[in-house]
Amino acid sequence: MSGDGSCSYSAEEGIRELLQSAKAKFRESVDVAIKLSVADSKSGESIRGAVVLPKGLGREVRVAVFAKGEHAKQASSAGADVVGDEELIEEIKKGRRLDVDWCIATPDFMPQISAIAKILGPRGLMPNPKFGTVTLELAEMVGIIKSGQVKFKSDRYGIVHVKIGDIGFTPEDLLENFNAVVAAVQGLRPTTIKGSYVRGVFVNSTMGRSFRIAGTG
């Protein structure tokens, strides 16, 4: 979140300035950083959730599904990249690494998946009812995730970092994704927070400076 915070831009202006200033010789990511007041709250709450980016991430989102029988068939038909049952869990225990962004499971698999929670958890892959990833509606959930759903969580400083695309996106597409993320985070305001919740919103590219967005904090 580096950069000169004394100058603020509208979201549209900030994104356009960001794209014009990106000079790296690779396709830089574009990220939004949202500074929240949760780090200062006595409860030490963290904010976590998921949001579908209207314009996607600009790359394939990969999904693994733990299911069997008809549910496994539904997941495969919906486009899941990896589908497995107890055998897959055993392979993960033995060191197989899942090259995916999300894991989904049917409810009956959760007791077995708990055995690999220490493997999936640190990578943010543990199925979670809060994200809709413990479900029998596998085809629907695979479709939602594939359309560009991303997870987010505030860090210990109360900052939420979310990738909203890359410098190959149009300003309009980045703006749509930006607005979706900000709205999702604002919608999770804890009732325990008094006064200001969003203290500042910034956009930046991987190697570029950050731009403070006016009217969002």
Swiss-Prot record:
GO molecular function terms listed in the Swiss-Prot or TrEMBL record: rRNA binding; structural constituent of ribosome; tRNA binding
Presence of keyword rRNA-binding: yes
Family designation: Belongs to the universal ribosomal protein uL1 family.
Organism name: Anaplasma marginale (strain St. Maries)
Record GO cellular component, one term: large ribosomal subunit
A biological process from GO: translation
Record-given protein name: Large ribosomal subunit protein uL1
Domain of life assignment: Bacteria
Sorted UniProt keywords: Repressor, Ribonucleoprotein, Ribosomal protein, RNA-binding, rRNA-binding, Translation regulation, tRNA-binding
Cited function: Binds directly to 23S rRNA. The L1 stalk is quite mobile in the ribosome, and is involved in E site tRNA release. Protein L1 is also a translational repressor protein, it controls the translation of the L11 operon by binding to its mRNA.
Complexes and interactors: Part of the 50S ribosomal subunit.
